[in-house]
Amino acid sequence: MRYLSEIKNKQITVLGLGVTGLGIVRFLVSQGLTPTVVDSRINPPGIDWLKQNTPTLTTRFGDLDSADLCASDMIIISPGLSLTIPAIAKAINAGVEVIGDVELFARINTKPVVAVTGSNGKSTVVTLAQQVLLAAGYKAALGGNIGTAVLDLLQSDLSNNDVDVYVLELSSFQLDTTTSLQPISATVLNVSEDHLDRYASYQAYIDSKLSIYNNAALVITNADDEATHSKAKSQLSFGANQGDYSLGEYQQQTYFMQANKAFLPVTSLAVVGKHNYLNALAVMALLSPFNISKAQYSTAFSQFNGLAHRCQFVAERAGVKYFNDSKATNVGATIAAIDSLATNGQQLIVIAGGDAKGADLNALTPYLQQHVKALICFGKDAKDLMALTNKSHLTNNMSEAVTLAKQLSEPGNIVLLAPACASIDMYNNYMQRGDDFIQCVMAEQP
């Protein structure tokens, strides 16, 4: 709280009035601060809340160049805004401090933080980690890039002392404006090409992810993904066949292994698939600083049913199973989904497409050749996907794609929506895309 006193008389600008920006404003106002609110949009999403609750705050909506950001002592920026935007870059060059909501949280918070980033699996890992902590009796708050904004969580804790530990999902965009976070444990789950429309290079994206390790008491790396590795002195690893936490055989069953000793059978986890087992191993490594029993893990694992749009089972029709992995917005996620569902030699019919955001799609090719019976494509970069295999088909929309998938399938096949692309060319978000897939599947006659 002392930090808030230190900045009370500073000229603070909140830049961006979406969900995150509104959370920043709410928090600052609740602590007696009066920020200026700036957004490039004339009517940003949070404008009605401002008018009703903080009508006296100074606001500047419209052209950022006219907002005079250089007059600020500090800018607290929403993660959706790039630091390379000319007006923002000008302020940075003028010496204005630019931070994000996670950085403000880190400067005030005194409770332990478990921090998770990665190209894929973040939401599943943090949700499962919270459930394990709750089963062990900890008051665990989940937020960041999922659910509740970090400053809303912090405000609740400052008022009610209702948090023992924070479990935070953090995007690379959030990490770019965060330097003070000191997690009790932190991981980069995996890295695959994504957001290359925002970063100058793939390495710049990797470096952004790896910054989560800075100041972490314990670093958790993926033994199977060299891009996640660290030179930190205090670290553990997880992996399919290697690492401190891994998968192994014991008494003719596959087990979660801890230091090569059988811990729990993978059947203790309610969701199936290699990617889910790896997520569980990551959780075990992340939570190693906490006192959690095998029974408490078993309880949480058995009650975890996964998240919507993440390899979500939709239906079985005429012996064909349909899975919705609309959250697979990059190549790595689609590979993980194919690899997980094709474990018993099933032939997959994959529906993919959307905006690839400049990513290299070629890593998909061996998986398409080995496990995929047909690749059905639509969306902005459909033709780039089609070039990967001679088993590809072009459609105009989700309805056509699902209908064609039904025609091409036979009993024992799996139809998988795993787009390998963002949804923004045709949908508001990946959830809307996944819901469209589900509706199309359910509309097909069995």
Curated annotation (Swiss-Prot):
Main subcellular location: cytoplasm
Recorded family membership: Belongs to the MurCDEF family.
Annotated compartments: Cytoplasm
Single biological process term from Gene Ontology: peptidoglycan biosynthetic process
Superkingdom classification of source: Bacteria
Signal peptide boundaries: none
Record-listed ATP binding positions: 118-124
Cellular component per GO, a single term: cytoplasm
Described function: Cell wall formation. Catalyzes the addition of glutamate to the nucleotide precursor UDP-N-acetylmuramoyl-L-alanine (UMA).
Record-level Gene Ontology MF annotations: ATP binding; UDP-N-acetylmuramoylalanine-D-glutamate ligase activity
One Pfam family from the record: Mur_ligase_M
Protein name: UDP-N-acetylmuramoylalanine--D-glutamate ligase
Encoding gene per record: murD
Native source species: Pseudoalteromonas translucida (strain TAC 125)
Annotated EC: 6.3.2.9
Keyword Glycosyltransferase: no
